[in-house]
Amino acid sequence: MEGILDFSNDLDIALLDQVVSTFYQGSGVQQKQAQEILTKFQDNPDAWQKADQILQFSTNPQSKFIALSILDKLITRKWKLLPNDHRIGIRNFVVGMIISMCQDDEVFKTQKNLINKSDLTLVQILKQEWPQNWPEFIPELIGSSSSSVNVCENNMIVLKLLSEEVFDFSAEQMTQAKALHLKNSMSKEFEQIFKLCFQVLEQGSSSSLIVATLESLLRYLHWIPYRYIYETNILELLSTKFMTSPDTRAITLKCLTEVSNLKIPQDNDLIKRQTVLFFQNTLQQIATSVMPVTADLKATYANANGNDQSFLQDLAMFLTTYLARNRALLESDESLRELLLNAHQYLIQLSKIEERELFKTTLDYWHNLVADLFYEVQRLPATEMSPLIQLSVGSQAISTGSGALNPEYMKRFPLKKHIYEEICSQLRLVIIENMVRPEEVLVVENDEGEIVREFVKESDTIQLYKSEREVLVYLTHLNVIDTEEIMISKLARQIDGSEWSWHNINTLSWAIGSISGTMSEDTEKRFVVTVIKDLLDLTVKKRGKDNKAVVASDIMYVVGQYPRFLKAHWNFLRTVILKLFEFMHETHEGVQDMACDTFIKIVQKCKYHFVIQQPRESEPFIQTIIRDIQKTTADLQPQQVHTFYKACGIIISEERSVAERNRLLSDLMQLPNMAWDTIVEQSTANPTLLLDSETVKIIANIIKTNVAVCTSMGADFYPQLGHIYYNMLQLYRAVSSMISAQVAAEGLIATKTPKVRGLRTIKKEILKLVETYISKARNLDDVVKVLVEPLLNAVLEDYMNNVPDARDAEVLNCMTTVVEKVGHMIPQGVILILQSVFECTLDMINKDFTEYPEHRVEFYKLLKVINEKSFAAFLELPPAAFKLFVDAICWAFKHNNRDVEVNGLQIALDLVKNIERMGNVPFANEFHKNYFFIFVSETFFVLTDSDHKSGFSKQALLLMKLISLVYDNKISVPLYQEAEVPQGTSNQVYLSQYLANMLSNAFPHLTSEQIASFLSALTKQYKDLVVFKGTLRDFLVQIKEVGGDPTDYLFAEDKENALMEQNRLEREKAAKIGGLLKPSELDD
């Protein structure tokens, strides 16, 4: 086998074929050996010189594939280094090989894969050579198409591939300038390409040629100027001749979808007529040759084969694309009304198909339609509404806040919504019956048909629910009466059992919950009362735990969505809360969780109603809740109890009187405090009590209960924290010494034992409680005077002296919060924190990138906050420790954990800015001399490593800052050693030389001209982030390709920021429409 690795002699093709056969068909040791030899063969830099022999003389198609792969590698990486005659030789060889395979009918039929692979290699050459070195390629290709049907068919495939490579996949493989250049070259050749396609479609008889031509045309349609399409009769050909044949129907529909998406002028009547005509023809062909508009597509799809299912998906894409672009064209002509409604009727039928991706396609269109109809209603003149009409509407004004308008009133205006009345009514039903589960619902039916607690949230389902919800909200605004009637009648059929099923009651309840905020208050009151009464009746009526659990989850979801109604109807709110307390004793999995979640959700929106004394009540309801808390929470798990306490904390925070608030807090914490005081007393007398696992669980639970209440009460929690603070820190110390004793007795393995893990839970919860309070505290003087010193004494020395496995990352998190809130008030405290945790933590994480992941993240958060709030602390570090600090920052750059990487880059950026602010002082000068180039080289190291793409924006900012320091003359000392360069060399010149050397050593395949041109662009653009980032991005493409083009510098935009801005604008828009934001998303 090794014979093929001898590159000094001619290649033994037969031996190569044998090795390839062994690799593909053999097994065991021989197969492994063949794989190793083939890998070495392909990796040899001279392998490409053997490719032509393999392609000419090999009898094994797999060997030919390997030869083409070797050529691909050469073309993408080293093409520009080859002499011109070599390049032309390879080019002509590949073209000749493709043509000879096409001219042999037998080969053309049997070796399709090999011909395709050769086509791809040709396209790789084209990306390098065309148009500048091969300007006549497209005319030659078109000229050769008349030589034979096979050549013509393959030319279509090459054109398709070229379009895909240039237009669809160019983002990361080519620089921006190159991609733009190829696109411009392509657009000059449009006419010839289009003429060829048109000629074949008009005259061609070979079915496979027609399909290849349509596939090629498909790739070009979306950027061929529309006049080519509209000045010929190609639309007529597509929408009649090729729609009838089953072979071409699917690809033709895709082509028509592309045409539907073109931007056409609005003022050209001839083009408008053609646009309507091709749509009319297409629907007519579908109705007569494929399926009538009345067909039950849900059933058809379920029994169809793969091709027919794909066709229905393509039909949905065609209809939604065409109608989204050209709906207004059809709406404006009364004679096209039937066509318009038939198209939408097809879409209704397609929407009923049980296939999520297809449903999402139609749903996007429905969103487009109903939002459009809604905004037309919004533009109705408010002045038209006389006071009498306003009363009849059941809402105060036309503004969205007051709920949906009366449909009777809207009939007075010539609105587009009237055209779609029947379609919208059908759509309401489709959406209601296909509603997916909202994220608040925790009780679900699994694949086995059992009712269980749901643990995994699917982001796809959450997004789909959001879209469905928005469509249903618009539909409710368009006809609130129809929506209400459909929902109430479907609910009646749940009660009478005629439509009862878990799926049906769920989707209906989820739909009912999703339209909260769309109705006027009066309508909503009538509607919600009916719904909740019916659902409560169902819980009584239905037997069996599963049935009860399903209905309970639906009641809880619905009531959680209507806080406005609950706020206005105290008796109902009280009934609902008592029902939730009842569900808290229901042990079916998921029900108790959901009861607690719904309780806290309602409390967040209605908290004020619990702290005031309601009419006909003897006390505020929170007092009743606290008095019965033991009974209510008796069957709950600890985590659920914490949620309950957290909800009570939210209510108590709403009490305005400080004395009353403190009394309620004291009452709420009475049970946990009694247990706490008892345990503190007992464990002081008998410390071994803390080794009992039950006691440890109780203590951890008590502290977790405090954390829950503190989370919701924030600064108002101070009296309770004062009650337990000193004993808690004593406990922290006692537990720490116990852990140390266990480690001393049993070695490091002790940290993994249940006993020590239980003790560490106590420590972690204590830290969490203190951190939670300090993060929300307003009384910063008290925090400094009362809390900080005992905390640092209890925590820091223990952390430093512990074995690494017993150190808690929560210490770092807690210290981060202390520095964030009061670091500026305790300079010595910050220095103590740094001295205690910096070196010992760095020593835990500097051996690799994975051990102690939580410590890593928290460590860099702490350094970042100290850098921001208490920078002076770093200046107190001795030089050796400061060097470790810089090393730690550069170490963070190299992490794959995004938090660590981005924090590291931010620390570096803040540090450089802090040093700059110090001005021309010895410390700053020393810093620049010692560390400036470390930061430059380490930033370039991660910038050019594709594993660190996610840090690109921050890397660019840091590099910009470093370059600006030099080019704006902010550094007043030479950055080089005297012997390195001639005296008097400026920092600018030295930086350019340094970067040029560094980059040419790292990327020897780049020419000095490329590097000089990159650096020249970079050092001119350091004031404009967008341009600067574009230059860096282009450089990153260039380093992957040998012999790139030195003129390749343009810029690229950042998508992430655009997305954030889009989300912000969408939220602003949604806030103006009743019901578009969920109740939980609204500000109180």
UniProtKB/Swiss-Prot annotation:
Superkingdom as given in the UniProt entry: Eukaryota
Importin N-terminal domain span: 34-100
Entry-linked SMART domains: CRM1_C, IBN_N
Gene Ontology cellular-component annotations: cytoplasm; kinetochore; nucleus; perinuclear region of cytoplasm; spindle pole body
GO MF annotations in UniProt: nuclear export signal receptor activity; nuclear import signal receptor activity; small GTPase binding; U1 snRNA binding; U2 snRNA binding; U4 snRNA binding; U5 snRNA binding; U6 snRNA binding
Annotated keywords: Cytoplasm, Nucleus, Phosphoprotein, Protein transport, Transport
SUPFAM superfamilies hit by this protein: ARM repeat
BP-aspect Gene Ontology terms: mRNA export from nucleus; nuclear export; protein export from nucleus; protein localization to kinetochore; ribosomal large subunit export from nucleus; ribosomal small subunit export from nucleus; tRNA export from nucleus; tRNA re-export from nucleus
Modification Phosphoserine occurs at: S1080
Localisation per UniProt entry: Nucleus; Cytoplasm, Perinuclear region
Family per record: Belongs to the exportin family.
Subunit structure and binding partners: Interacts with GSP1/GSP2, polyadenylate-binding protein PAB1 and PRP40.
Function: Receptor for the leucine-rich nuclear export signal (NES).
Any further remark recorded for this protein: Present with 7080 molecules/cell in log phase SD medium.
The protein, known as: Exportin-1
Gene source species: Saccharomyces cerevisiae (strain ATCC 204508 / S288c)
Gene expressing this chain: CRM1
